[in-house]
Amino acid sequence: MEPLREIRNRLLNGWQLSKMHTFEVAARHQSFALAAEELSLSPSAVSHRINQLEEELGIQLFVRSHRKVELTHEGKRVYWALKSSLDTLNQEILDIKNQELSGTLTLYSRPSIAQCWLVPALGDFTRRYPSISLTVLTGNDNVNLQRAGIDLAIYFDDAPSAQLTHHFLMDEEILPVCSPEYAQRHALTNTVINLCHCTLLHDRQAWSNDSGTDEWHSWAQHYAVNLPTSSGIGFDRSDLAVIAAMNHIGVAMGRKRLVQKRLASGELVAPFGDMTVKCHQHYYITTLPGRQWPKIEAFIIWLREQVKTTS
């Protein structure tokens, strides 16, 4: 049996830790040449460091052949243990940095929410938190937050993922909207009689399981209005349907939260008054579990303040 002193001498020390970095790069690439390129060393220098590490640890880490190197069984164990330790260390460093109200914050939102509600208000957030650098991404898919590097997402739906932490943001109502000119041309003011002769503008992806006409169908059913809800023009974003309505193309089913500024400015009108339908869906915020970072919490609090000021 080896003396205890000899075994202890083979445990990691400061000098060996620097060589472990060389080992990690070589193991990741399965190549001394590629490791040398990444580390700005010569292949022979990489090979020398690995040889020294193997000798000091008393473990053969690589099997060398003429054209390639491969990890031994023991080398694989060391590599995965090292990788796990580095990942844990990197996460701890990231968590420490994110305890401050600074750094980057990446947001993901449905395009219509971002364009009509979120982005116009962001100036207030950046004035309050100038040390937080924001990135806003948009899309209609429910993305993998961790894989996409997203800190916080805003969705409009009725089924938050059970794997994520979610926070209610605000509810929503829908109502028909069009341009003043279109309402006058089709005699829509305060009567739905002529609506059946109008072009209906649809958000085909209003929520995850939307059939493509659900908004118009639910409104027509609620008010017992006979409409050809399957006809009209479809868009993959609510704001595009609204833009089409502003350009006198037809009548869109507007989300009240997203169209209220245009109703107030007169760019749009609600020809049938306050004939709204409360949505089963709502706006909610999702984050990864355990991400109670101050900058994320600050943004969620700010979002809720915006809801109060725009209600």
From Swiss-Prot:
Inducers of expression: By growth in D-serine.
CDD domains: PBP2_GcdR_TrpI_HvrB_AmpR_like
GO molecular function: DNA-binding transcription factor activity; sequence-specific DNA binding
Domain HTH lysR-type: 15-72
Reported consequences of knocking out the gene: No longer induces the dsdX-dsdA operon.
A Pfam family: HTH_1
UniProt superkingdom: Bacteria
Statement: the UniProt record of this protein carries the keyword Transcription regulation: yes
Keyword DNA-binding applies: yes
DNA-binding region of this protein: 32-51
GO BP terms in the entry: DNA-templated transcription
Listed PROSITE patterns: HTH_LYSR
The entry's keywords: Activator, DNA-binding, Transcription, Transcription regulation
Entry similarity comment: Belongs to the LysR transcriptional regulatory family.
Record's function text: Regulates the expression of the dsdX-dsdA operon.
Protein's name according to its UniProt entry: HTH-type transcriptional regulator DsdC
Taxonomic path: Bacteria, Pseudomonadati, Pseudomonadota, Gammaproteobacteria, Enterobacterales
Annotated gene: dsdC
